[in-house]
């Protein structure tokens, strides 16, 4: 099953931790968003493979914006 991963807050992508093709465990950090001087992790909802990453470092993202797609195992 394919899972879309969304940003829970509006802010700037401070760091992308995972790369397309990476194998992820549930709750692995995909990216970190800076919002009001706080770092908010965007995590994988399930174990699987990161198949798409829509945001790059320094991109501005909106709340509920798609950040990534994970193909579950």
What are these regions (language model features)?
Residues 21-30, 58-67:
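A structural signal for short beta-strand/turn segments enriched in small hydrophobics and glycine
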Residues 51-52, 69-71:
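Short alpha-helical linear motifs
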Residues 34, 39, 52, 57, ...:
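Acidic-residue sensor for enzyme active/binding pockets
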Residues 1-12, 29-45, 72:
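Short beta-strand-turn/beta-hairpin segments enriched in glycine/proline and small hydrophobics
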Residues 15-23, 52-55:
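Short histidine-centered loop motifs in beta-beta connectors
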């Amino acid at each position: 099953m394919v899972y879309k991963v969304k940003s829970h807050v509006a802010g700037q992508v401070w760091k992308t931790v995972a790369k397309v093709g990476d194998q992820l465990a549930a709750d692995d950090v995909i990216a970190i968003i800076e919002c009001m001087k706080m770092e908010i992790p965007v995590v994988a909802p399930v174990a699987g493979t990161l198949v798409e990453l829509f945001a790059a470092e320094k991109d501005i993202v909106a709340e509920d914006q798609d950040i990534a797609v994970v193909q579950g195992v």
